[in-house]
Swiss-Prot record:
Residue sites binding (6S)-NADPHX per the record: 56-60, 122-128, 151
GO MF term set: metal ion binding; NAD(P)HX epimerase activity; nucleotide binding
Keyword Coiled coil belongs to the record: no
Role this protein plays: Catalyzes the epimerization of the S- and R-forms of NAD(P)HX, a damaged form of NAD(P)H that is a result of enzymatic or heat-dependent hydration. This is a prerequisite for the S-specific NAD(P)H-hydrate dehydratase to allow the repair of both epimers of NAD(P)HX.
NCBIfam families assigned: yjeF_nterm
Domain YjeF N-terminal stretches: 12-206
Protein name as catalogued: NAD(P)H-hydrate epimerase
Gene3D superfamilies in the cross-refs: YjeF N-terminal domain
Family (UniProt): Belongs to the NnrE/AIBP family.
Natural source organism: Bordetella petrii (strain ATCC BAA-461 / DSM 12804 / CCUG 43448)
Catalysed reactions listed for this entry: (6R)-NADHX = (6S)-NADHX; (6R)-NADPHX = (6S)-NADPHX
Length: 206
């Protein structure tokens, strides 16, 4: 699959696993890239809301949240499922967030932020959002605030570009390692993604 057409989820996962097997720590790099993306577009002191889901996409958002908090941003974290079942790398990211003095809540804040980081679901999502997640996505969309999606907007099937329910509408999508093919072809997934950006994290796709 040519880069212009995007890569399959399997191709991206295989490249990720090769890098991890070589001892590469990718989550700190992804989180730093997301934080840098926000910092380049919003002044210090801006209110950032990081939506952290139950997987490693949520871990990327937590790393970004910790870095932005340390840089002087007002950062809020919403974790609808809490930290209890996070995978190991994301659990370390959560510990880093707490060590930075951060706290989290399960619900959205009452006041809309200046910008939202979407770390709810990444390229692994292949089923419709359940009612709880869909309600959250709809509420964020209703704010009409700029959203940075990490890897893929939550609610989009990264392989097909289908929207699984109603997707979070991003102004920007920052893909890591490679852009998923569901974001590169015309369709609802591409429309939800907004402006596409890529950080390879130094990982080569075969």
């Amino acid at each position: 699959m040519r880069a212009e057409s995007g890569y399959s989820v399997l191709q991206i996962r295989q490249a990720e696993q090769r890098a991890l097997a070589q001892g590469r720590a990718l989550m700190p790099l992804a989180g730093a890239a997301a934080a840098g993306f926000i910092a380049a577009r919003f002044p210090v002191g801006s209110v950032v809301l990081a939506l952290a889901g139950p997987g490693n996409n949520g871990g990327d958002a937590l790393v970004a949240a910790a870095r932005l908090l340390a840089a002087g941003y007002t950062v809020r974290v919403t974790m609808p499922r809490g930290p209890q079942a996070l995978p190991p790398d994301a659990a370390r990211a959560y510990a880093g967030w707490r060590a930075q003095g951060g706290a989290e809540q399960s619900n959205l804040p009452s006041d809309p932020p200046d910008v939202v980081i979407d770390g709810l679901f990444g390229i692994g999502l292949n089923r419709p959002l359940d009612a709880t997640w869909q309600t959250l996505v709809d509420a964020v969309n209703a704010w009409n605030r700029p959203v940075l999606a990490l890897d893929v907007p939550s609610g989009v099937d990264a392989d097909s570009g289908r929207v699984l329910g109603r997707a979070l509408r991003a102004r920007w999508t920052l893909s890591f390692i490679g852009a998923a093919r569901g974001l590169c072809a015309p369709g609802p997934g591409r429309e939800a993604a907004g402006e596409l950006h890529l950080d390879t994290l130094g990982v080569a796709l075969a």
